[in-house]
Amino acid sequence: MSDNKNVNQDKGLQGNEKIEQAIAALQQEATQEMLAHTLTVIRRRMREKGQFILSVEPPTGDNQLRIGTVKTGDGKIWWAAFTGFEEELKGGGSVQSTFLTDIDQLFHSALQVNEIEGIILNPWNRTIKIGRAHV
């Protein structure tokens, strides 16, 4: 069944289900070992030239696109990224504009923006927050 899913999936997203599985395992068993495993899976996808989906907010007066953000309960702001379109659609909000970005480039860009804590991957379901220290 997953083979059919990959046929209709962007090439850069193929393999991201490994990240989703690692996050699910981390949610079941929140240990340092599982966190290290999950971060290793994400790094491996980065080395494989994997991609994430970013939502973009419409331009305001300055005509600049802004990467979609999520504000967590503690008031911190995170860039929202998704492993696949299914995860992005789980937000239930309005349909957003999206684009694909290389995982590596996303992490490098996040380090340049002081207004965010890092990247929240799949904020609606299989979630992991990757803070600047782990980027």
Where do the language-model regions lie?
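An interfacial alpha-helical scaffold signature
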Residues: 1-132
